[in-house]
């Protein structure tokens, strides 16, 4: 057999897949299941998106794009996100990826050495904790507190978690995972 890297012992799983198995078993017994656990809610793709995809394929736009993403898309995302957040975002600050997991891992590899701490939101994306520990770091969770307007970070509590060994704080918009404002 092949010897595998010891760090694989630290690689966690995404709990949503365990929930998916339990949901499938529940559904197999005839129960109604609303599959929100994987973010795959089977909503049909909007017709204008299908049309744009078909036009792009017909125009031969099927090869590689620039590493950080198509410039026009980055510009549109910067404008839209900036408008929603009430801030100015440059297209150079926007990177389009094929998914969240690879970029989270690359970010942590860039800013964290083994033994360092990273603060991450809980509830949040389970991959944060898994990848921090996989890469040899210490995952330190922080939470959001309910307020009259929704939820907010308890800044004093967050500051109390910061140590000289803290290398990063991951911020996660509460729209994902709990659709809160």
Language-model-detected regions and their locations in the chain:
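N-terminal small-domain helix-loop-helix segment of the aminotransferase-like
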Residues: 5-99, 106
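Short acidic capping loops at alpha-helix termini that bridge into adjacent secondary structure
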Residues: 88-94, 114-117, 165
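Conserved PLP-anchoring active-site segment centered on the Schiff-base-forming lysine
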Residues: 110-132
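A short helix-loop-beta submotif of the ANL/AMP-binding
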Residues: 134-140
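Active-site phosphate-binding strand-loop segment of PLP-dependent enzymes
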Residues: 140, 145-181
